[in-house]
């Protein structure tokens, strides 16, 4: 355990009732009764960057940015759960009908923003 200097007990935070010492007597600083951890995600994407154009999938791809068509740029997910810009993937599929990341046959699972 830790060394205690000058006879003082270290303050111990506890989630259950019990004696925990502090500098000002036997009072606890606080007692944690209940804690609910919450996590939220803004989208369900394993990788947030398009592996073809290297731009974030929630932003427009380079081609749509150049042609000023940001609203038309949507994300496409394959059955392998990898996501890409639909514009990028449609060009990729013309040359190679496999996912650029895992090399599985490319089958569209869903398209959306």
Swiss-Prot record:
Record's catalysed reaction(s): S-ubiquitinyl-[E2 ubiquitin-conjugating enzyme]-L-cysteine + [acceptor protein]-L-lysine = [E2 ubiquitin-conjugating enzyme]-L-cysteine + N(6)-ubiquitinyl-[acceptor protein]-L-lysine; S-[NEDD8-protein]-yl-[E2 NEDD8-conjugating enzyme]-L-cysteine + [cullin]-L-lysine = [E2 NEDD8-conjugating enzyme]-L-cysteine + N(6)-[NEDD8-protein]-yl-[cullin]-L-lysine
Coiled coil, from the record: none
Entry keyword annotation includes Kinase: no
InterPro entries given in the database record: RING-box_E3_Ubiquitin_Ligase (IPR051031), Znf_RING (IPR001841), Znf_RING/FYVE/PHD (IPR013083), Znf_RING_H2 (IPR024766)
Principal location: cytoplasm
CDD domains cross-referenced by the UniProt entry: RING-H2_RBX2
Region Disordered: start-end pairs: 1-26
A Pfam family reported for this protein in Swiss-Prot or TrEMBL: zf-rbx1
EC annotation from Swiss-Prot or TrEMBL: 2.3.2.27, 2.3.2.32
Record family assignment: Belongs to the RING-box family.
Name the UniProt record assigns to this protein: RING-box protein 2
Name of the coding gene: Rnf7
């Amino acid at each position: 355990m830790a060394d205690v200097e000058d006879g003082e007990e270290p303050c111990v935070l506890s989630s259950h009732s019990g004696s925990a010492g502090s500098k000002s007597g036997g009072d606890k600083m606080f007692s944690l009764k209940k804690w609910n951890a919450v996590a939220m995600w803004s989208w369900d994407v394993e990788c947030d960057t398009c592996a073809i154009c290297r731009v974030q999938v929630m932003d427009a791809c380079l081609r749509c940015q150049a042609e000023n068509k940001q609203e038309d740029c949507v994300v496409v997910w394959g059955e392998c759960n990898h996501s890409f810009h639909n514009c990028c993937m449609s060009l990729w599929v013309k040359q190679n009908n496999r996912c650029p990341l895992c090399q599985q046959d490319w089958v569209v699972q869903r398209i959306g923003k």
